[in-house]
Amino acid sequence: MNIFNTNPFKAVSFVESAVKKALETSGYLIADCKYDGVRGNIVVDNVAEAAWLSRVSKFIPALEHLNGFDKRWQQLLNDDRCIFPDGFMLDGELMVKGVDFNTGSGLLRTKWVKRDNMGFHLTNVPTKLTPKGREVIDGKFEFHLDPKRLSVRLYAVMPIHIAESGEDYDVQNLLMPYHVEAMRSLLVEYFPEIEWLIAETYEVYDMDSLTELYEEKRAEGHEGLIVKDPQGIYKRGKKSGWWKLKPECEADGIIQGVNWGTEGLANEGKVIGFSVLLETGRLVDANNISRALMDEFTSNVKAHGEDFYNGWACQVNYMEATPDGSLRHPSFEKFRGTEDNPQEKM
């Protein structure tokens, strides 16, 4: 398969004036639950070859065994109920069932089987005992996530020629769920081992109802909402028409160095975060990490050197951007690279 830039629709930061305008025009808004997962694009071409890709069109390490030809994709494309028989792209959120976001995203980025992920691997791997009686893996094996552990929340589907073209898909947000459900019913039938779901979605008719729904979903443990203009279409890239309603904004960047705890305070001698060069060109200190991460990062730096994490791709969260472009309360959120290549954003 020819891998292309999938460039899915990415929600922009919440802008109340723009959202109110969409509400006035349509009389209501679509509000989808925002899931804490890894954005994924599943591309299936006309010869039934599939590619499981990240939002920046990189192969997802733990799902590489699902790439390539599968007779079931061929059967699905040939099914009279398939609305895109020449191929399609699915856009959604990938999650690992039964674990939190950090664990799940870590598993999806994982390249090799280790003791702590053996339970999620598709098959058993041989083990052996060390002279001290510790069980270790006997050899080196690529990590293949068991598809039964995989959950996919679908946002959109489009024909492959539109996906390849990079053009917007002229289907309104209010109609997209019907297209998604038409495909989801087939996915459930042909690939029952994977959990295929549609994003939990609501219609809200005023801003107060939107606020109430947001607070309700936050209380349930969700990240927030994706608010959609019902009459807007599926666009490519970060465009207005989908808005993120969540406590924090996010930015991607590259680690330039580590930040150490202040002398005389409790975190003295520990790595408390990173100096990160954002894609915008601004350098920020992204700290506010857990004690467990402090211990992990400090241990790695002491073992491998202070430049161990330099060049790693990461995500920084922040409350808002000021008019001069600086960020309020930036904090380290997660690494964006793969286990095999932490410097390449997935």
From Swiss-Prot:
One of its GO terms (molecular function) is double-stranded DNA binding. The keyword ATP-binding applies. It catalyses: ATP + (deoxyribonucleotide)n-3'-hydroxyl + 5'-phospho-(deoxyribonucleotide)m = (deoxyribonucleotide)n+m + AMP + diphosphate. Keywords: ATP-binding, DNA damage, DNA recombination, DNA repair, DNA replication, Ligase, Metal-binding, Nucleotide-binding. InterPro entries: DNA_ligase_ATP-dep_cent, DNA_ligase_ATP-dep_CS, DNA_ligase_ATP-dep_T7_C, DNA_ligase_T7, NA-bd_OB-fold, NAD_dep_DNA_ligaseB. DNA ligase, which is expressed in the early stage of lytic development, has been implicated in T7 DNA synthesis and genetic recombination. It may also play a role in T7 DNA repair. Belongs to the ATP-dependent DNA ligase family. This is DNA ligase. The gene is 1.3.
